């Protein structure tokens, strides 16, 4: 019997039953690669859910960005309310990797800001994979990075069972070894406290406390309790408390790792000295020797991940263990928006290695640091035994490896046709667009506008705002959770128009959007290629009055093919509707917000509103950069710090580490002044 319980107020319709049947048959028959070629709004996620439910396997649903992953997680949680649907993305709010710039002899240390709530969700995912089979993990591409050793993580879990004798001192020691800290004053995630015969633990994977009640040496009761009120939420017979970090190194393995690091250091120093690189040799010896001392004394050092190969006991060049290795052997991979996601897999490894090579060549790291890396594309696919690619525009590679195992899904259960596509001249495009926006807004419909450049998007947003249009600009500096909030606000009618560059194409489920406007549609390139145009047009495919405006002076080959494919689908859909007497109806899908609700960040993000006066604030920040810190007004400091952090993150993304480091130092100075003023 399948382990999943699919809950939905409707049954498969249109060509969904055929697609589901073909994909399930392929999975059960051992097909390695299959493709679901589904037009936007045809219910691809519902088809995916049915395939997962009918095959009964643990599943990894891979998305190409955090926003899409959150949306998929929300939808799958609605389909599987009684099963484990987990969310696994990068837990960094900000991450600047360690780097060295030889031209200016500048070393930049790693700096990062970890989102504790997302870290909790990551631990929840791995815990579910150990304890049950009805697990769906929705992940971003960050799942291909190293994640400890699953066998050691499982082995290190501290068990508690009602009725069994407990060595309390031994359990406390095990918790400390698993990187939990004792705090008898304040309980919380990653901490524990002891009061008499009661042990309370804040597991890494939950925001509830685990209370273990003892009678002498015997476990009398185990309960989940509310950390704030102390209310008993659930009684348990047994529980395993997994480590607070995924990276767990037993003492004997740590000793072996130290020996291996010393051996590699000796060999590398001989090489550098032989090459006459005396400065590099001295630098490496000093850094590595200090790290070794820290590892021996406390089992940890800054940059410990650079010794991951030795700590895991892996061979040189071998693949790291990642989230995939926490799955059982018969797991199923579903790659959403595969034409984008598969390309990301190719790029991650190369970018990581280029940066590390500079650090190794200049004596900042041992060569083994290069093995602290994401999976190579071929390593990833060797671990994925069965895959279903999902896309409205699958790439050539996916279609090739699927070898005819393609299920096409064109008919929408709602009967809604693909959008009408109209080409209009670029002359006066902004004023023409303004009129269209006002018309749609009067009907309480939403509009998406995509431009070619960030500057154009900013200018258009300003212009629309000046003309009393409720508009927001979705840009790359916005944190993942806030991005979800902005999209939710569009759906809820907080504003009518969302402007962006390359953030509005794949997978965003926005039934309220009736108009998509593509400015400069005839400018050939990645953003105006056939696949990109089809995806962007598809953002209006869930609305009965869906329409796409392409502003262009000439008809490019990409435009012609995109329009031709859209018309082909419209004809198929129209014929099906006539044959079955179907009248197109609105999707009526509620604006789910479960991820934000779970993290309890929704209202906080709305209150922060960092983009409301983005242009004005950025101007103040630039001006302040040229002024002496001592001359700044105190009430301007928080605003300035926020903007400098945005600039710092943008610089890090562009690999301009010198500028990012300068901004980081500036931020520290401003914060010191702010703290000093409050004393």
From Swiss-Prot:
SMART domains recorded: DEXDc, HELICc
GO cellular component: cytoplasm; excinuclease repair complex
All copies of domain Helicase C-terminal, residue ranges: 429-591
Subcellular location: Cytoplasm
Limits of the Helicase ATP-binding domain: 25-176
UniProt keyword terms in alphabetical order: ATP-binding, Cytoplasm, DNA damage, DNA excision, DNA repair, Excision nuclease, Helicase, Hydrolase, Nucleotide-binding, SOS response
PROSITE patterns to which the protein is assigned, alphabetical: HELICASE_ATP_BIND_1 (PS51192), HELICASE_CTER (PS51194), UVR (PS50151)
A Gene Ontology molecular function term of the record: DNA binding
This protein's record includes keyword ATP-binding: yes
Any GO BP annotation: nucleotide-excision repair
Domain UVR positions: 638-673
Domain of life: Bacteria
Function of the protein: The UvrABC repair system catalyzes the recognition and processing of DNA lesions. A damage recognition complex composed of 2 UvrA and 2 UvrB subunits scans DNA for abnormalities. Upon binding of the UvrA(2)B(2) complex to a putative damaged site, the DNA wraps around one UvrB monomer. DNA wrap is dependent on ATP binding by UvrB and probably causes local melting of the DNA helix, facilitating insertion of UvrB beta-hairpin between the DNA strands. Then UvrB probes one DNA strand for the presence of a lesion.
PANTHER family, sorted: UVRABC SYSTEM PROTEIN B (PTHR24029:SF0)
Subunit composition and interactions: Forms a heterotetramer with UvrA during the search for lesions. Interacts with UvrC in an incision complex.
Descriptive protein name: UvrABC system protein B
Organism: Synechococcus sp. (strain CC9311)
Lineage: Bacteria, Bacillati, Cyanobacteriota, Cyanophyceae, Synechococcales
